[in-house]
Regions:
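Extracytoplasmic electron-transfer domains, predominantly the class I c-type cytochrome c fold
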Residues: 28, 40, 69-117, 368
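Electrostatic cytochrome c docking/interface patches
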Residues: 28-53, 124-125, 130-133
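Blade/loop signatures of beta-propeller domains
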Residues: 124-174, 337
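Repeat-blade elements of multi-bladed beta-propeller folds
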Residues: 141-149, 183-205, 224-255, 278-308, ...
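A structural motif specific to WD40 beta-propellers
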Residues: 173-175, 215-218, 264-268, 327-328, ...
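Surface-exposed loop and turn segments in beta-propeller and other repeat-based domains
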Residues: 179-180, 270-273, 329-350, 402-431, ...
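Beta-propeller blade signature
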Residues: 258, 312-325, 386-400, 513-525, ...
Length: 639
């Protein structure tokens, strides 16, 4: 490929690095690179300062594989400017707060084995739209409502909108690829409105592309990585005087409202004051109100034995979409208070945590907002309200609790539990880290509505929407800190579709590791079919970044189920029996538009594939939790 691409600049070093960069890597060595052939590309004296900073501040997590911290081979694939951005405004901003700009540059150069003076030039400008492609189409209001595609969050696409039948699946072909330079992941499900495809990226930009050609209509620079989908306000089809807004959040806790036509900023609001707080999950949008869930990176800060752990607490905030004004705010746990000193004479705080990693679903019939929560970061385990690892329902208008059901008790966990030098920050023995990462779904069945929830423990639940009582629970996988039911759920015509991301986890035993896609009776939890993950697609590819598990969002029509996997494969299944009808390997290079080439990688995170009139859109690349990086938005067509 002749175009610009930093993600593959180091070429074969990527596969080699996977063999040796972390503690215990012998068990994970790539079959393509014998260890005795590996030479550390950043071992030279020109990287001494950065190496020392890294060893003192970063190695504890990045060389032990602690939690979701990316291993060295992932960091090696980045450009220095991407590391600097992460330390300044991104996921590592707290860890980077004590470093000077020169120190950030030094560690960025060491981690990427690239001196800034030798850094590749900025990419060529994106191909801008002209003529008809640049015009906003007021005849096309949003095709779907948010990341869940409708208020209930069931990821069901109407057949008339999707426009793809089983007999057309085999006709799908790549139409265009849009690459985002320096990005390592795309975790933003694209919005379809006004003839545009709009999404965010890990480098902090939001892009609005012409859906037909992939050219750039506008681009907006946010404060940090955008992991949420972009929500576009509805308007009456054909109303050329409409001024729809486009909303999204970034991982530093800012909500933005843009003019959906031009990309100009209308308002910006930081929804929480905690320095580690962010917005990872897409807000729910209903009748002009944004319901914003907050999560946090603070559990990673606990890997520092001198960090005063922990003070973040999750929340859901209701905002007026037009103005950003707060309508109500509901904390998920009580206010943290000092709890004495640790063995390092550092003040401890608690309770804390209970982040909301998933998009709430709207139970329109009962006027309630339903979401699931994460674990507690610090004691006490019985903090009030007992909402950790729970499914919670709030009144849509007031935020008052309707009901809650805590499905795993006593799950206190932070990175101090897996970094030896930081054990002083681990609460007790440390819990299993069984968050609810997947969004809830209000599923409609012949027996009535059921709230679906999926946990990292590998268990799927059906709850009564009236009171939260468990109607059924079905174990599908072994589960683990990065396994089990990780992000996506879908439901259609009384069937729940559940992806399982099981990977080997030394802390979890018992049930067999069972990655794959499962169909359950949404009313009873009975298994209808199972489609185990492929055991062959990772052959010849380095571990651990290639795993066959399914940890991405799922979408469905009446006859099709679509989802991606950590092995980079995008698959379409027969909804009736789980048979794979179409399989596209995206773990490869792509000729990007405008000479900006890119690569696909793992498909993971909350975004799901989206269909519109026989065209399929999906992001590939998930440089997180040691999955394969990538930087492309792909468009396929069966027309």
């Amino acid at each position: 490929m002749a175009g610009w691409s930093r993600i593959v600049l180091v070429g074969g070093l990527v596969a080699l690095a996977a063999a040796e960069w972390h503690v215990g890597a012998a068990a994970q060595r790539s079959e393509v690179a014998p260890a005795d052939q590996y030479v550390d590309p950043s071992a030279g004296p020109q990287f001494t300062e950065g190496r020392e900073i890294y060893q003192q501040n970063c190695a504890g997590c990045h060389e032990s594989g602690a939690g979701r911290a990316p291993l060295r081979f992932v960091l090696l694939q980045l450009a220095p400017r991407a590391i600097r951005e992460a330390l300044t405004n991104g996921a590592m901003r707290l860890q980077g707060s004590g470093l000077s700009p020169a120190q950030k540059t030094a560690v960025a150069e060491y981690l990427t084995a690239t001196k800034s003076s030798a850094e590749p030039p900025a990419p060529p400008p994106y191909r801008r739209c002209t003529g008809a492609a640049a015009r906003f189409d007021f005849a096309q209001p949003p095709a779907y409502d948010g990341i869940g595609l409708n208020p209930s969050g069931d990821h069901a696409m109407p057949d008339r909108v999707a426009g793809l039948s089983p007999d057309q699946v085999g006709k799908l072909r790549l139409k265009w690829a849009f690459a985002v330079p320096d990005a390592t992941r795309l975790r933003s499900q694209p919005a379809l409105a006004g003839g545009a495809l709009t999404f965010g990226g890990s480098t902090g930009e939001v892009f609005s592309l012409d859906r037909e050609t992939g050219c750039l209509r506008w681009m907006f620079k946010a404060s940090a990585e955008v992991r949420t989908a972009v929500l576009v306000e509805h308007w009456r089809a054909g109303d050329a005087k409409a001024h729809p807004l486009a909303w999204f959040g970034d991982i530093t806790g800012n909500m933005f409202a843009l003019d959906a036509v031009s990309g100009r900023l209308r308002w910006k609001r930081r929804v929480t004051d905690h320095p580690a707080a962010g917005i990872s999950a897409t807000p729910a949008l209903y009748k002009g109100v944004l319901y914003v869930p907050t999560s946090s990176l603070e559990e990673a800060s606990a890997a520092d034995p001198h960090y005063p752990c922990c003070t973040f607490r999750g929340a859901v905030i209701a905002l007026d979409g037009k103005t950003g004004r707060t309508l109500w705010k509901r904390w998920t746990v009580g206010e943290p208070k000092p709890l004495g000193a640790s063995a390092n004479d550092t003040t401890k705080f608690g309770p804390s945590g209970v982040a909301v990693w998933n998009t709430p679903s709207v139970d329109v019939k009962r006027g309630q907002l339903i979401f699931a929560t994460g674990n507690t970061y610090s004691a006490p385990a019985d903090a009030m309200p007992p909402w950790s690892n729970a499914v919670v329902a709030l009144d849509l208008k007031t935020g008052r609790e309707r009901w809650h059901n805590q499905l795993t008790q006593g799950d206190l966990w932070n990175y101090g539990c897996i970094v030896k030098v930081a054990k002083v920050n681990c609460p007790g023995e440390g819990g299993p880290d069984f968050d609810f990462g997947a969004h809830t779904v209000v599923a409609h069945t012949a027996r009535g509505d059921v709230v679906l929830a999926g946990q990292k423990s590998g268990v799927a639940y059906g709850l009564d929407p009236a009171n939260g009582k468990v109607l059924w629970q079905t174990r599908l996988g072994r589960g683990g800190a990065t396994g089990g039911i990780h992000f996506g759920l879908a439901a259609r015509d009384g069937t729940a579709f559940v992806p399982v991301n099981d990977i080997p986890d030394p802390n979890v035993n018992g049930f067999p590791i069972s990655p794959g896609l499962y169909a359950l009776d949404a009313a009873t939890g009975a298994r209808r079919w199972a489609a185990p993950a492929s055991e062959t697609t990772c052959a010849g590819r380095p571990r651990p970044e290639c795993m066959p598990g399914l940890g991405a969002g799922v979408s469905t029509t009446s006859r099709l189920v679509l989802t991606g996997a950590a092995d980079g494969h995008l698959r379409i299944y027969d909804a009736a029996n789980g048979k794979v009808l179409w399989d596209m390997d995206t773990w490869r290079g792509f000729d990007g538009l405008g000479g900006i080439d890119g690569r696909g990688g793992s498909i993971a995170g909350a975004p799901a594939p989206v269909l519109w009139q026989g065209e399929l859109f999906v992001a590939s690349g998930y440089g997180f939790a040691n999955r394969q990086p990538g930087n492309v938005m792909l468009a396929f067509t069966a027309r």
